[in-house]
């Protein structure tokens, strides 16, 4: 079992090394025609992230 653990550890180390040295994408610039429906910032839409409502619901559930 120790041999298997060592092999798995070696594979993880090698994959991590390869991932760290990977080249970036060939075209890292954003596309010229982005999706108008995509919302990259969840805080820009108040309906998407309601922290106060979440806190109130947790407090009301506990109390």
From Swiss-Prot:
The keyword Nucleotidyltransferase does not apply. One of its GO terms (cellular component) is membrane. The modification Leucine amide is found at residue 62. GO terms for molecular function: toxin activity. Residues 1-22 form the signal peptide. Residues 23-48 form a propeptide. AXPX repeats lie at residues 22-25, 26-29, 32-35, 38-41, 44-47. Keywords: Amidation, Antibiotic, Antimicrobial, Cytolysis, Fungicide, Immunity, Innate immunity, Membrane, Repeat, Secreted, Signal, Target cell membrane, Target membrane, Toxin. Expressed by the venom gland. It is found in: Secreted; Target cell membrane. It comes from the Eukaryota. The keyword Signal applies. One of its GO terms (biological process) is defense response to bacterium. May be a minor component of E.pomiformis venom. Belongs to the MCD family. Mastoparan subfamily. Antimicrobial peptide with strong and moderate activity against the fungi B.cinerea (MIC=5 uM) and C.albicans (MIC=100 uM), the Gram-negative bacterium E.coli (MIC=200 uM) and the Gram-positive bacterium S.aureus (MIC=25 uM). Shows cytolytic activity against insect cell lines. Has potent hemolytic activity against human erythrocytes (EC(50)=64 uM). In vivo, peptide injection in the vicinity of the head and thorax of lepidopteran larvae induces feeding disorder followed by death due to starvation. This is Venom peptide 2b.
């Amino acid at each position: 079992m120790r041999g298997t653990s060592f092999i798995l550890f070696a594979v993880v180390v090698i994959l991590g090394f390869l991932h760290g040295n990977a080249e970036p994408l060939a075209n890292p610039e954003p596309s010229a025609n982005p999706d108008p429906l995509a919302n990259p910032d969840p805080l820009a839409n108040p309906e998407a992230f309601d922290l106060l409502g979440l806190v109130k619901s947790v407090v009301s559930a506990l109390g």
